[in-house]
Structure formats: C-alpha cells, structure tokens
Amino acid sequence: LCRTEHMFFEGDRIKAVREMILADDEAGRRVALAKLLPMQRSDFEGLFKAMQGHPVTVRLLDPPLHEFVPHFEKEQRELAKDMNVPYEKIAAKVELLAEVNPMLGHRGCRLGNTYPEITEMQTRAIIEAAMNVKKTGIPVHVEIMVPLVGNHKELRYQKNIIDQTAEKVFSERNDRLEYMVGTMIEVPRAAVTAHQI
C-alpha cells in the first residue's frame, strides 16, 4: 500500500501543495497540481520498477488539507513571505481548514469529490508512470484505492474521474493498461453499505 500523502511533505512538493490549498479557484489549483504531476509520476515510476510486477495499491490523497499548512503564527508569516501573499490570507485559510473531527471531516474521497482536479492529477501520474515502466519491459499491476468511502455514490463518482482520466492518457499515448479501482472498508457507514460498494 502506497500512501501518497507522504510524498507531499518534501521541499518543493509541500510548497506546491500549499499553493494548491491557498489557490482562490480551480485554475489556481490546477497550476499548482501541474507542478506536482511530474514529481508524483517520478515517485510512482520508482515504485513500480522496484516492485517488479508485484501488485501495487496506490491510495489517493487521504488526509484533510489542514495537515499541510502551518498552524503557528510564526510559520504562517514565513509562508506568507515565501508565497508573497498577505499573512491574513494564510491565517484565514488555515482557520477555514480547521476540522472539528479530522478523522471524518473533509478528507479522503470527499476531498477528491470537492476538488476532482486532485484525483485527476494523481490518476494521470499513476497511469503515466505505469505505462512508462511497462514500456521498459517490467510488468505493472496497478490498483488505485479511493480512501474513506462511506457509500457507493462516493466511490462511483471517484471511479468515473479515474476512468475518464485514464482514458485520456490512453488516447494521448495510443496504448492501454489494465488497472483496478477499489476502496477499503474503513468507516462504519461503508461497513453497513458494503454490499452496495
């Protein structure tokens, strides 16, 4: 199981993640996500090569966005300076992202459903990486896990985004690749409705 959020905390990556979080609109988020795409693709290529044909389950972004932003004023001021935005904007966004119950809040598939461009970027990175590695003669078995699904509609919505994005990549490259999409039953609602999921 590859938890993709751990890839986001290093150097330039955390900066791009924070740019995405602080973006005012989808266009701004897409600009930041475009910076993350080659980093994610490279990570997945390394992973698929190392696994030498063994199945790899890649879990899409799971934690709430507040985990990626600084919570103390000093660090928020440093971030504001680094990003050339007013400190007040950073402080307001951090306050807006605060979760009462971060274990069940705006995270997992709900984050991907609110911001489908995140799911699109991660799917593109996974599929492109798998196809690149496959071209070298190494078999690749990709399993994409949608996190924190509570009902079948959430999974269906995310699967549609994943499938549409994969089809775009297949069309661009005039090649195809088998992959699976699934979830983990990890919340009570998912257990109760598992027969639908």
What are these regions (language model features)?
Residues 1-197:
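Conserved alpha/beta-domain cores
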